[in-house]
A protein has these predicted regions:
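Short hydrophobic/aromatic beta-strand immediately N-terminal to the Walker A/P-loop
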Residues: 24-26
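Conserved substrate/cofactor phosphate-moiety recognition/catalytic segment
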Residues: 37-101, 113
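The conserved Walker
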Residues: 30-31
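Conserved phosphate-donor/acceptor-positioning beta-strand/loop module used by diverse small-molecule
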Residues: 123-144
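N-terminal pre-Walker A segment at the start of P-loop NTPase domains
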Residues: 1-16
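Acidic, metal-coordinating catalytic cores used for nucleic-acid/nucleotide bond scission
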Residues: 106-115
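Conserved GTP-binding G-domain of TRAFAC-class P-loop NTPases and closely related GTPase folds
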Residues: 138-230
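Phosphate-binding P-loop
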Residues: 15-22, 95-97
Length: 230
């Protein structure tokens, strides 16, 4: 029976031949923007590793039997779970980067400095970095937040939305216009699937299939191939 470490080691060995090797996609968008929906549809079948501490946090909340309505009475327990979820996600990202595996880094986009630092680090390793920004109006974000299984207070949604919006121009300068895809997700999921997501999926696959240009990446791959022949 394979252990967790055995499986991770196998992933590292197979990373050299992964379709999305040395490709990293950052997702940005506030609560209620529909990032999870976009990820499931636009990246389906690509094999990229999704890095999302919120997803790990939500799974742990459910497992612990806590409420997804985030009551104040459960704040201390939630904080402990959130810390563990972030640590687990960090380990997953570190392991994936060791194998230079393709990444989907799912966040809100509130913290420009954090994303900028992550992107610079990945570029230094040879990664091609792009961003998918899922955009909605504040009214739509507030309404969708009410309908979500895990909700946050309205003022939190508003604050997050404003912070993310203020970073759009910065992200365009950081990633470059050709590597930043902005999705208008004010319409229903059905309308988004039939029109926008088909286009996004094509762009994502085009970026994944673009030949690697980084000398650092090519040197790493050559070194790995040489090591495998020994």
């Amino acid at each position: 029976m394979k252990t967790f470490d055995d499986i991770r080691f196998q992933e590292l060995k197979e990373g050299l031949y992964d379709q999305g090797i040395f490709k990293a996609f950052f997702l940005a968008g506030g609560p209620g923007s529909g990032k999870t929906f976009v990820t499931g549809n636009a990246f389906g079948g690509t094999g990229l590793r999704q890095i999302n501490s919120d997803a790990a946090f939500e799974r742990a909340i459910k497992k612990a039997g806590l409420s997804l309505k985030m009551p104040d009475s459960e704040e201390e327990a939630r904080d402990m779970i959130r810390s563990r979820a972030k640590a687990l996600t960090g380990s997953k990202m570190d392991m994936s980067i060791r194998g230079r595996l393709g990444l989907i880094i799912d966040g809100t986009g509130r913290d420009y400095n954090k994303i900028s630092a992550q992107m610079r680090m990945l570029q230094q390793l040879g990664y091609d970095c792009s961003m998918i920004f899922v955009n909605t109006s504040l009214e739509v974000a507030l309404e969708r937040n009410k309908q979500r299984e895990r909700t946050v207070p309205e003022y939190v949604t508003t604050k997050s939305w404003k912070a993310v919006q203020s970073n759009i121009g910065k992200f365009q300068n950081l990633f470059g216009m050709s590597n930043m895809i902005i999705i208008d997700n004010n319409e229903s999921d059905k309308e988004l699937v039939t029109v926008t997501l088909n286009k996004v999926s094509k762009v994502v696959r085009s970026l994944i299939n673009t030949p690697i240009k980084s000398y650092t990446a090519k040197r790493w791959m050559a070194s790995e191939r040489k090591a495998k022949r020994r």
